[in-house]
Amino acid sequence: MKAYLLLCFLGLSTLSIAQSAVGTWKTIDDEDGTEKSHVVIYEENGKLFGKVEKLINPEQTICTACKGDKKDKPIEGMQIMWGLKPDGSKEWKGGKIMDPKNGKEYKCKIELKDENTLNVRGFIGFSLLGRTQTWYRVVE
């Protein structure tokens, strides 16, 4: 009986991991299709946050366009996504995302399309006024 319960628990744990946006994601530029960075999405106090782990062939490594405490700081290690709250089993909304290229902040929502594909939408005002990038899970 204990072995059965353990197997059930492990199965549920695996299912919840597969349905989570937590992990490392390869970002793809929606304008030219090139790989730009790896972003680590992590959970803290029930919300999702994202931090740049690695830049791929960077045009810039310092966020000169950023404002506030991010101004003139390295992009690697920088938090660029914050405050996303779960909205169903595969969506998170209500957060913000910052584009290090121009330093602008946008409202953000993300949707897990499958265990290795994440749609990240940044927008102003309404979700219709924005753009979506597709990120891919880094599988090591």
Description of each model-found segment:
Residues 115-117, 124-140:
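Edge beta-strand at a domain terminus
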Residues 1-5:
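Positively charged n-region of N-terminal signal peptides that target proteins for export
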Residues 14-20:
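Sec/Tat signal peptide C-region and signal peptidase I cleavage site
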Residues 29, 34-99, 105-106, 140:
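Central antiparallel beta-sheet cores of small beta-barrel/beta-sandwich binding domains
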Residues 20-34, 133-140:
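K/E-rich alpha-helical interaction surfaces of small helical-bundle regulatory domains
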Residues 44, 113-114:
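Structural motif
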Residues 30-32, 100, 111, 125-126:
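Short polar/acidic secondary-structure junctions
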Residues 6-13:
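Bacterial N-terminal signal peptides
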